[in-house]
C-alpha cells in the first residue's frame, strides 16, 4: 500500500484522470473529494463489501433455482 501525506486542500492524481483532494480535517475524520470520470464507480469500502455480498448471495440463489428447474425439466 502506498501511503501519502496530504494537508487540507492538497490533492493526489491517479492515472491522469482521477483527482483525490483533502477537503477538510476535523479530529480523526478526514473529508475527501473525488473527481473522476462518470464511468468509474466509487464506493465507500463498507458499501462495496455489502454490494459484493448481496451479489454473491443472489448468484447462489439463482444457481439453486436453476438446478431445481433442470431437475423438473429432466423428469
From Swiss-Prot:
Q: Which organism is it from?
A: Acetivibrio thermocellus (strain ATCC 27405 / DSM 1237 / JCM 9322 / NBRC 103400 / NCIMB 10682 / NRRL B-4536 / VPI 7372) (Clostridium thermocellum)
Alphabetically sorted, this entry's keywords are: Bacterial flagellum biogenesis, Cytoplasm, Repressor, RNA-binding, Translation regulation
Q: What does this protein do?
A: A translational regulator that binds mRNA to regulate translation initiation and/or mRNA stability. Usually binds in the 5'-UTR at or near the Shine-Dalgarno sequence preventing ribosome-binding, thus repressing translation. Its main target seems to be the major flagellin gene, while its function is anatagonized by FliW.
What family does this chain come from, according to its entry?
Belongs to the CsrA/RsmA family.
GO annotation, biological process? bacterial-type flagellum organization; mRNA catabolic process; negative regulation of translational initiation; regulation of bacterial-type flagellum assembly; regulation of carbohydrate metabolic process
Q: Which gene encodes it?
A: csrA
What are the recorded GO MF terms, alphabetically?
A: mRNA 5'-UTR binding
Q: Which Gene3D superfamilies match?
A: Translational regulator CsrA
Looking up NCBIfam families in the UniProt record yields: csrA (TIGR00202), PRK01712.1 (NF002469)
| Name the UniProt record assigns to this protein | Translational regulator CsrA
- Cross-referenced PANTHER family: CARBON STORAGE REGULATOR
| HAMAP family cross-referenced by the UniProt entry | CsrA
